[in-house]
Amino acid sequence: MKDVYLFNPEHDLALAHGAHNYTAPPFARQFRHDLRLLPAWVAPADSYIAIPDDCSIDEDSRWLHDRHLDITPIHISKVADVGSCCIHPWGWDATLRYQLLQAGISPDYLPTDEQLDWIRRLSHRRTSIAVHEALGNAFSPCPVELTTAEDVAAFMHSHPGCYLKMPWSGSGKGIYRVIDPTGDNHVPRWIEGALHRQGSLLCEVGLDRVQDFAIECICRDGHAMLMGYSVFDSDFHSQFGSGRVAPMEALHEMLLGMYSDLDPVIGQVLMAIDDLIAPHYNGYLGIDMMLYWDKNGRIALNPCVEVNLRMTMGMVTAAMGSRHGLQGSFTIVASESGHDVELQQNQLK
């Protein structure tokens, strides 16, 4: 059975929409087009990577060959010709399933409606609350889910510097950091719009960040397995900025140097994922975490900032460092036309 990888970064937006007929905005479609080969870093040798039909097979083959990636590009309309295959998108949602069915791919190789319902349900940010609760709320302040503008306003006035997060969002999208609750005239409209579209907001106390990182996992046969670590920097609104590319052992040692009790906590998180997610989901999974300064000036751990039931940028950087022997920094740089795929390699210095 052949492996087929596919980049659909609009996945989080499609989850928020919920139905199978979501149309991504132009910036998301451009992002998907320009970084179409990104999963090739994660894919095992002799896999396929599905690309838009208007892209050149020859050009993408040269790009992959120049980076010593033994991956074959194939137009999405031709994936059905592969026959028996295992499809690995950036993330599964109803829209992608519908698109692949329209491309002639057998439903035997796609998740069922019930499986997609579980993915959407577990991709809700309240899953992070369940993980905190499974760990006994023993580490950092737990997010709270609020459903009215009045309750959200009360929270942000009590916690200046807090984060308001839409339930279905990722990679820093759908997040509002409230620095001045009384002087920010935009935030009330943002709250009303978010509650209207998604029904609730996850509200989090702002923490004095030391380092963002994640554990990168795969769920298979009812069990979550640790694949590696990613260390990254994010901006003011928690959007991905850059990722560190290094061997897994080096990243692990760096994190242990800042927080020596990390490994037992990761074990507890994996047990929570085994209970909460793995019985209902097979695929890639990333758990974002954060080291921060506590009120006593010590480094503390937030063991679950968010859970992503999909592939992540951290999986890309982890594979670059551990499997492909690269070291440096991974950054996606916007060009005038969008996000230039050629800049992936140029940023590894």
PLM region spans:
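A long amphipathic alpha-helix within ATP-dependent nucleotide-binding catalytic cores
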Residues: L226, Q239-I299, G338-L348
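ATP-grasp fold ATP-binding core
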Residues: M156-R177, H196-R209, I287, E306
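Phosphate-binding site of ATP-dependent enzymes
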Residues: H186-F240, L291-C304
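Conserved N-proximal alpha/beta basic substrate-recognition cap immediately N-terminal to
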Residues: A28-V42, A50-A154
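Glycine-rich phosphate-binding loop of ATP-grasp-fold ATP-dependent ligases
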Residues: C142-P143, G161-V187, F213-A214, F236-M254
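N-terminal-proximal low-complexity accessory segments that begin disordered
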Residues: M1-A45
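C-terminal structural cap/anchor segments
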Residues: N282-Q344
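ATP-dependent carboxylate/phosphate-activation module, predominantly the ATP-grasp catalytic core
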Residues: C217-L270, N308-V333
